[in-house]
């Protein structure tokens, strides 16, 4: 059973990821749901994932729940043996710190947006090699590139051109 931390569980990619996980309950279990501010939706999600912890960066309302954890606890959880995979479905650069922490903790990290790879791709890839982590892109464009270069030697590719982007 893969234990998953879902960064950005209340966004569109996060909600889609939850649907896939819920359809594959025998393979995956949510260890923690992470959101920026949508505390109402994350509470609903947590009811469906009874064992999941909750972390909200900027809650809109005061929440009280035994499941609620602080950022330090989130970092400890990601570092622990209780997590196998981190899905980074946070837009922009906001998830970069948690992505880096997940990589340095040796996790499998599924990245759903291009920004972290554009900003720090070489650094993150080198860190993944150093710490034995996996970076797997799940956004359409960079997932296609990832799939296209699997099994190829690094020096055999000099250029990649994307002919369209954004749908």
Please provide the spans of the model-predicted regions.
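N-terminal Rossmann-like dinucleotide-binding module
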Residues: 1-49
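Residue-level signal for inorganic ion chemistry
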Residues: 10, 46, 86, 106, ...
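Active-site-proximal loop->helix
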Residues: 16-25, 45, 119-133, 148-151
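Short internal beta-strands
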Residues: 31-36, 52-58, 113
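Beta-loop-alpha module in the N-terminal Rossmann-like domain of NAD(P)-dependent dehydrogenases
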Residues: 69-102
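Redox-cofactor binding/interface segments in oxidoreductases and associated redox assembly factors
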Residues: 87-89, 111, 162
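Conserved anion/nucleotide-ligand pocket segment
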Residues: 142-167
């Amino acid at each position: 059973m893969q234990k998953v931390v879902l960064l950005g569980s209340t966004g569109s990619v996060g909600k889609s990821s939850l649907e896939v996980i819920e359809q594959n309950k025998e393979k995956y279990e949510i260890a923690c749901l992470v959101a920026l501010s949508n505390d109402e939706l994350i509470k609903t999600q947590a009811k469906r994932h009874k064992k999941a912890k909750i972390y909200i960066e900027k809650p809109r309302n005061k929440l009280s729940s035994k499941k609620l954890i602080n950022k330090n606890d989130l970092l400890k959880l990601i570092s622990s043996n209780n997590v196998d995979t981190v899905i980074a479905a946070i837009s922009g650069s906001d998830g970069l710190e948690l992505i880096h922490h997940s990589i340095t903790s040796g996790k499998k990290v599924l990245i759903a947006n291009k920004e972290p790879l554009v900003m720090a791709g070489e650094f993150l890839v080198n860190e993944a090699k150093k710490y034995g982590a996996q970076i797997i892109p799940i956004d359409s464009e960079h997932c296609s590139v990832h799939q296209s270069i699997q099994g190829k030697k690094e020096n055999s590719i000099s250029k990649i051109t994307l002919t369209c982007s954004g749908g």
